[in-house]
Amino acid sequence: MVVRYSLLMKVSFAILIFLVGCNENATSSNDQYLTDPDISEQTKKPSRPIIDEKNKGVTDTSVTIEWDKIECEKNFSHYNVIVYRKDRIEDVITIRTRNNSVFIDDLKPNSQYSIDVSSCLHSACSESAKIEFITLNEIDYYHTTEIEKNVYGSLEGEVRFVQTHVISPEGRKNEPEIITGRDALILFKPSIKNSSSILMKIYSEDGLTSKVVMKSPSMLPKTDQPIDIDENNKVVSYSNSYWSAEIPWNKMKSGMSLHFEDENGNLGIIESERIKFSAPSELIIQNIDLGMLYKPRGRNIVIKELERTAVDYFQKVPVSKLIFSDYTPIHFEKITLPNGTVYTEKSADIGGWHQGDMREAVGKALVSTGINNANLGIVASSGYSQQYNRLTNHITAHTNIGYYNNGVVVHGGSGGGGIVTLENTLHNEWSHELGHNYGLGHYVAGGTSHGPDTSWGWDGYYKRFIANFDWKRSPQSNIRPDNQEVVKPFMDKYTYLWDAMSGGYDHQNGIISRYTLHHPYVARIIQDWLKNGAVVINNDYMVWDELKNIYVYKGTNFKVPIKKGVPVVTILGVYDPDKINPSQLYPPTYSNYGNIFDLEKPRSESSLKGWQYVKDVNYLDRVNTHWHTMLVNRKEEKICRFSYLSPKGKKFEFLGYEDIENKICTGGRSIHYLEDGKKNPIESKYNDYFLLSIDGDGEISYVPDSTIGESKICSLKMSGTVYGAGFIKGNSCRQIDGVFMNGFQWAFTLNQSGVNSTYTWSNECVLKIKDKDNNIESISIPNYRIEKNQSNKIHLNISREKPIIDINVYCGEHELTSIKVSDNPDIKLLKGPIIVGQEHGYTSYEPKLPSGWFKHYDNFEPKNEINHELGKMRVNDNDEYICRFNFSDSDREMKFVGYVSQLSESKYICTGGSEIYYKKNEINIELSSKENDFEWLSVRDKNLVGSKIEFDNNKTLCVLDNRSFYGAGYLDENNRCTQDRQIHWSNGKQWLFSTYKTMTYH
């Protein structure tokens, strides 16, 4: 119970004891004390509480404090808590509780308070533990006293779910729905503010699953507001009214209901029918850096910081699981376009951010579309095709630079159809171009600006709210293009953000996020697009059924991978089955996350070729060989050939169809040979004929008789009872004179529908891959141009289990192109896959190093998996690790900050390099540590995120960021970046700069 009173007034009050603490033992001793107190216990004093500063929460109007709990000391009674304002000591709040924490509301903003806490037995109390605090001078963004009631009972109120956005549970059209299988923060605001503690119970369809003690409003998570805000701006909090608790991903599913219970037994419930769940969507984004006739730039920040960017972008998209993967970069030193053009030095085209023939044919069609197709088991497509064969939510983003007729050009700024072409993989370019892939156009709904009626975002890793306005931009109104609606700045201080598709913002707005917070209406459109994507479960493609809230089987013609999300080699190239355009295979690219399929093997490995005498064809030959057929009475029948001898001795070669049941080649009931007015059936002797395989080389022909000579074959593909095959003579497809069908000579003009006049051997095309053990894997690829005016492109994944050494493309007996494959050192630099969400949580981004400065230790190496945690500075054109060591002069010792230089394997020094030195008595002294005797700098600490990193002794670390100079130091009293006064640059001047950047934890 909380009592407020003036020392000048006498106030009587009832004492409320919270029965949370020592349970039955404590209760028993209390009962005993009421009738027969233990005299020895009456004189004993309990131990003094120890207040936990880390668990203190302060807002403008409330505070929560916590202290060490007394573990059921005999005759323990309660804690006394006394709160008073320093400038008005007559305003006192007294609380008597058995909880080891307390929430106090209705305090005065920007005021100094003191709290005394003592623990009491029935007879005596301990000395008080004291803590002082100042309530914040902050702005409560969600300050409205009105609530949207959706929790009913004696503890009614409002509940909101927080995932990518703060949303209502009912599922509104203008905001995302709750994501199944994703962690959530629950916010609860009681209608009446009289609760000191609230317990949240989580129920599923099977009953109670867990209980969570909610954090008081003063413990509500912080925002992404920069720490070094202007002194004229106050701290902004999301709200000072909501209780909060987290629910893990595996409890977030349909059928969940929530019960809220306070210390007085009041109960509020939101039933499962009022909580609308959407699909547990998954999203895969592949990332690759390209250079076309020019070396790749190596500036793809997503690839460099895969863990950080994956976790960051996860906060912006309504998915349950996000997978970021990286490919090894590709340097295209020679390029063959699908039209046959070959470049070895530069493109003949004019390149631009949005234009260039290589940009379209290589970056978008070959690489992004190719990688997407390879992960669906599609081995080839037409060379210029950018068709998005969307089944799963799989997108490939690339950065790309090319050498064109007008010089070296960086491409970027486009997205859609599973493709993203970027110059900058951070900020709004990424968010905007990915948005096009989700079906979003420019200026959704006429231009979407955040405003006072749109929700904030949430970062589940840093556990901070993301504001929907710009923290640093000067205040101004946003005006919607379509209806001129004006959105004024929040409190006339902060400009509201535009959605990514309406301009967004090209800077890091707060202290944690480098991607754009989508407007909730736009986020809902994204969610609706994503939930239609299939996932692979138990060797089947499955899609989410919103009515049943489960995954159900999806029928599709796409292959299901035999291995999902495994290391792969992706083979890309261009080939022309017609052997007109040149073909080219490119150096393979590698990823740690791709799909492997049981790809079609070439028929030629087990298939017979050409005309085959039926007695020589066994069962396996029949099964493994692809045979030419013709249409007979709407049924495909195998074409066959035999030597026919008429009753009067006329001999010719006849093309018919195989009657497999009777093992003859026949013309059937409708075709006969007319001789002397008599109709003679045309059929072979038993098992004495030839079948025609699809495989072979060149055009297919036969000799009807010696007078006609060798002729190309033709056949009919007509509905009804008209059928047959023959030879081409002049402008007709015909048989030997005398062969009739339905009373007419068997002859048809070539140009009419249903006459197939082009028969060629298949000339099968095969991709052959040889591994280091000389094993060869052969994969069938199309033996025809998919589009008649261009070459095909190859895109397929194979396993990385064994290194490959050769790749060849054959069509028939002709080798079209080949490439020898050498070891790729970039494979060791791959970081992916980074999987965020569901059971993976944020484990891929948890720090592996201590925070701040730490001593070098044995076997420490700045390996690929931790180098993103280490602070870096620019030295000439390289990013070098920041380090610090103690430098001793004869009369003093100081800290020097330099960069790490590797001497040999596992041996490092911290140095100032050749340009920075210590000057004493006109002598330049080199600045270098002893071997492995220095400190590294870790810049990862989510609890200190946004805080400036110290140089030493409360001095702020600063780093130069230009090409002319390098180094790091601290900010002096004049806000200049410097080190000790005797540290100089090579030009003889003191190392002292007014242009620099400060470093913060992330």
Curated annotation (Swiss-Prot):
Domain of life according to the entry: Bacteria
Biological source species: Vibrio cholerae serotype O1 (strain ATCC 39315 / El Tor Inaba N16961)
Cofactor, free-text remark: Binds 1 zinc ion per subunit.
SMART domains the UniProt entry points to: FN3
Name listed for the protein in its UniProt record: ToxR-activated gene A lipoprotein
Annotated region (Disordered), positions in chain: 31-53
Active-site positions on this chain: 433
Gene Ontology CC annotation, any one: plasma membrane
Gene3D superfamilies per record: Immunoglobulins
Domain Peptidase M66 residues, every copy: 282-536
Signal peptide (UniProt feature, chain positions): 1-21
Localization per record: Cell membrane
